[in-house]
Structures are given as C-alpha cells and as structure tokens.
Amino acid sequence: LALELEHVNIALDGFELCADLKVGTGGFIALLGPSGAGKSTVLNAVAGFVPLASGAIRWGDARIDHLPPGDRPVATLFQDNNLFPHLNVARNVALALTTRARPSKDDTRRAEEALSRVGLSGMGARMPGTLSGGQQSRAALARVLLQNKPLVMLDEPFSALGPGQRQEMLALCREVLGGAGRTVLFVSHDPVDAAQADAICVVIDGTMSPPRPVTDVLDAPSGPLRAYLGK
C-alpha cells in the first residue's frame, strides 16, 4: 500500500469533504466528478496546502499529514504550467534540482535528459513563449520527473488542450511516471480522460468513493454520477 487517506475530513468556507482512499504502489487513479465537487481539495490536502479537520494521510507506514508541503513525498502538476518566461526551457526544468540562476552542467544535462523523455529533445534552449501549449505541458512534466517524488498528482494540467492532446498527455504520464513505479492521482471532469486510469474514484458533493474498476464506473453509473454523465 502506497497512499492511504483514513477518515479524512476537510472543512473550508462552509464546504465539507469526506474521503477514504487506499492506493497501491504504481497505481494510476482518476478522481472524476463535476467542477466544485472537491477533487482538487483532495489533492491539496495530500500535498499539504489545506489542513485536515480530522483523519490521517499516510504514505506507506508513515503519517505525512503533519509534514510541511516541501517534506511530503509529493509532486503536483497544476493547471498553470508555472514556467518562468525569462528562463529557457532547460533552466525551467532544472529548477527541480536547484534554484541557482545558472544551473550546473550536470543539472542542465539531467534537465535535457528529462526533456528528451517527454518528447522535447533539443528544445532546452527555447524560451517558454515559443512553445505550443502541448509542448509547455511536456516541459512542466519534465520538471516533475526531475523532482523524483514517488507520488505525482495532476490537477487538470492539460485542461487547456484539446481532447486528443489531453489523452496523449495522460498516456505519456502513464508511460514516464507509471513506468518508473510512481503512483499517480489525476483530476478530471471528463469520463473519456478518466477511462485511461487503472481505477476511478467518483467525487460528487464533497464525498469520494473508493477506487473502482473503470468499466464498473463508466459502463453502469449510478446515483449522482449517472445524472452527471447524462446516462
């Protein structure tokens, strides 16, 4: 068992969310539901950006909910790729390794290797503004790779892309993250995107279901999910 949320309760500005979750090492899990349901809140709680009202978050055998965000075994990719426009692509990626204005030759080499893994070989000298939206997403993914955290969370980082590109990016995430044994949680409001997961947690009205097989969730939805999907 890699990640566990045990009786987690979060209360923010009148919104309350309850979540229990168990995910094995290397799992590729979708959190599916409408906007405002609490999907991003779950990720923010795991990352340490919002406090728990009660419950526990564990990674392996250790509780992590008391740790500051920087000390948790988590890397997060947000909707905004957070690429600095005044730094070239390689330097942006190397920020996962150093905050120095000029990274070392070794850090630059590692950044270039990460860029190659996501299909951006030879683009390290480019400026972010010269990249397409899909290429910027790949550069941000390369930076997450270099963070080398065992848990990666994707908070709809590809939402600005078209459906085909989103699915291509999710497939790339599965390849480069899942292939390295990392556990991945990704947020989606699109059942087609969520279908790429190993399992789906449905998040609606502040309640999250346990992970269930993709076909069970999408082929025979019930309750609020059935209404949301229009089936």
Predicted regions and their residues:
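Helix-to-loop junction immediately C-terminal to a conserved catalytic motif
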Residues: A47
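Short coil-to-helix segment of the ABC ATPase nucleotide-binding domain corresponding to the Q-loop/switch region
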Residues: L87-A96
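A short, proline-enriched helix->beta-strand linker immediately N-terminal to the Walker B motif
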Residues: L146-P150
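Catalytic Walker B motif of ABC-type/P-loop ATPase nucleotide-binding domains
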Residues: V152-E156
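Conserved ABC ATPase signature
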Residues: M127-L131, Q135
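ABC ATPase NBD coupling module
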Residues: R63-F78, T99, K105, V217-P221
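Conserved ABC ATPase "signature" region
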Residues: K105-M123, R174-E175
